[in-house]
Curated annotation (Swiss-Prot):
This is L-lactate dehydrogenase. It comes from the Bacteria. It holds the Pfam family FMN_dh. It comes from Chromohalobacter salexigens (strain ATCC BAA-138 / DSM 3043 / CIP 106854 / NCIMB 13768 / 1H11). It is found in: Cell inner membrane. FMN binds at residues 106, 127, 155, 251, 306-330. One of its GO terms (molecular function) is FMN binding.
Length: 392
């Protein structure tokens, strides 16, 4: 199969992966309306084409929290990434480091913090959930510090798990899930040999390290389900600050007032995100939410964004609407599942080339030159209202 776009990696991953893993990454909450609108709304943003601007000295380089980035992109935290390729978090982190961008390790990764941090030379980012077990939270924060992690991504949009119907249909959860997953693995021998057999252990490295015993997939579902904390509030941010003095990003902001609260409570950055449409179906797409949030807090903290980004053009659109850096989730997981580290590195090369084309044809020589003037109407908020279908 010829891979020329990130969508090609999705098709390749679907063939290689057992259904329970493919749909775990690919699916969303409820009827998946928000999942689809993330992509559709972003693709509907119109950019101004500018010509004869001498674009021979174009640069994608930027900086975030004093850390140089080769382009305004980072790999997002994705749970169980180590199930998509052998020691998948390590492979993805190496690919990101080789391309000069950050990798964010999930709390519920297969590979533990120390293993991933020791595999790369640039600082690792780490993502943390608020869980009932505060002892675990303190434990992983201490491990993150010891491993040289500089930036913490604090996920706040999971006080309860989303209703993901695909997981029940595919065997990730639900009745006879273990048997269904085993049968799927047998019928996908390439994955079974590379990851199922040689990618062991398949436990949650950070959780197992804390509990002192292996945490298999069934344990993961039960442990995480019992540890989500609906009592989460801004006071938890203060508690975490007692243990973390580095840059802290709040992930899961969709409303300008929440963004203002993040500023008031001392966050260094936010991620405008609906969790890739995996939590609450029916909330606005990130493309719809971003302009108003940027108007509210731009310049007060760093604005990151995710959800719906499928190519370098989408990155340019998000930056023009007010984001500083974009997180990639599903896009890199498909590439990781297809070709491991090499696949993720190639995906990032595709994104870089697509960004260069888009910036050349919009007349933006640097990331700083991308802004509301890059949009057709000259206003991010007006542009999105005019370019998207009224039915959405």
């Amino acid at each position: 199969m010829i891979i020329s776009a990130s969508t090609d990696y999705r098709h390749a991953a679907k063939r290689r992966l057992p259904p329970f893993l493919f749909h775990y990454a690919d699916g969303g909450a409820y009827a998946e309306h928000t999942l689809r609108r993330n992509v559709e709304d972003l693709a509907g943003i119109a950019l101004r084409q500018r010509v004869l601007k001498d674009m021979s000295h174009l640069s994608l380089e930027t900086e975030l929290f004093g850390e140089p980035l080769a382009m305004p992109v980072a790999l997002a935290p994705v749970g169980l990434a180590g199930m998509y390729a052998r020691r998948g978090e390590v492979q993805a982190a190496r690919a990101a480091a080789s391309k000069g961008i950050p990798f964010t390790l999930s709390t519920v990764s297969v590979c533990p913090i120390a293993e991933v941090a020791s595999a790369i030379e640039r600082p690792l980012w780490f993502q943390l959930y608020v869980l009932r077990d505060r002892g675990f939270m303190k434990h992983v924060l201490e491990r993150a510090k010891a491993a040289g992690v500089k930036t913490l991504v604090f996920t706040v949009d999971m006080p309860v798990p989303g209703a993901r119907y695909r997981d029940a249909h595919s065997g990730m959860s639900g009745k006879h899930g273990g048997l269904r997953r085993m049968l799927q693995a047998v019928t996908h021998p390439s994955w079974a040999w590379d990851v199922g057999l040689h990618g062991r252990p398949h436990d949650l490295g950070n959780v197992s390290d804390y509990r002192g015993q292996p945490t298999e997939l069934e344990d993961y579902i039960a442990w995480l389900g019992n540890n989500f904390d609906p009592s989460i509030s801004w006071k938890d941010l203060e508690w975490i600050r007692e243990f973390w003095d580095g840059p802290m990003i709040i992930k899961g902001i969709l409303d300008p007032e929440d963004a203002r609260d993040a500023v008031r409570f001392g966050a260094d950055g936010i991620v405008v995100s609906n969790h890739g449409g995996r939590q609450l179906d029916g909330v606005p797409s990130t493309a719809r939410a971003l302009p108003a949030i940027a108007d509210a807090v731009k310049g007060d903290l760093a604005i990151l964004a995710d959800s719906g980004v499928r190519n370098g053009l989408d990155v340019v659109r998000m930056i023009a609407m007010g984001a500083d850096t974009i997180l990639l989730g599903r896009a890199y997981i498909y590439a990781l599942a297809t070709a491991g580290e090499a696949g993720v590195a190639h995906l990032l090369e595709l994104f870089e080339k697509e960004m260069r084309v888009a910036m050349t044809l919009t007349g933006a020589r640097s990331i700083a030159e991308l802004g509301s003037d890059s949009l057709v109407t000259g206003s991010a908020a007006a542009s999105i209202e005019r370019t998207l279908s009224p039915s959405l």
